[in-house]
């Protein structure tokens, strides 16, 4: 039974949880099993903004979307693999029955997000920001206010350590292991010829680095102008004559730490090799 907020306040000793599940068949089949296990130790509430724990049952896409949406201090977020990819998940169908007993033993940490500011708007991403266009476009790139290069191509990808196994990997970026505190920038399809070239390599920057991207061209068809995609969702389109500022920031919520080398390597092997 889901308890209302006022009912929970009468039972302050009980830790509370809210469960989010994707609509994937695997996720739907796991949902009743997860609730049965969680109800052994926690009280379910109908409002995620008052829960002590947020459980996300699905793949990495479901996890990322809701981790950004519900990020707040005091919340612990735990992923359960009810989808396909599960780099952010701690439990799956083989060990759901161990969730309740392991809650107090789990190690938690804050995650690195990427903060992007354009005009007066601020956005956050857990995996990456993808600045791209359908045609080659010019960008002036600055690193900590030092001019880095003039880039012309279809876009730039800026990712976190945890996001390095996502689109970043598909774009030939490096996979960063969990204990590496960094952000990574990858060029997307640079335009190269005898009078114009770029570094053409991913760069891995210290976590406190600030990146500034200046788009100076103010002429293009709206559909061909650069757009900004945050973790797969388009947040701005038709960019011209503007400046984008990017830096890392810490999440407010706590997540299960994934610093164990062996388990991370096994996850890489299972996902990309075997």
UniProtKB/Swiss-Prot annotation:
Its EC number is 2.7.1.23. The active site is at 60 (proton acceptor). Its cofactor is a divalent metal cation. One of its GO terms (biological process) is NAD metabolic process. It catalyses: NAD(+) + ATP = ADP + NADP(+) + H(+). One of its GO terms (cellular component) is cytoplasm. GO terms for molecular function: ATP binding; metal ion binding; NAD binding; NAD+ kinase activity. Belongs to the NAD kinase family. Involved in the regulation of the intracellular balance of NAD and NADP, and is a key enzyme in the biosynthesis of NADP. Catalyzes specifically the phosphorylation on 2'-hydroxyl of the adenosine moiety of NAD to yield NADP. This is NAD kinase. It comes from Mycoplasmoides gallisepticum (strain R(low / passage 15 / clone 2)). The gene is nadK.
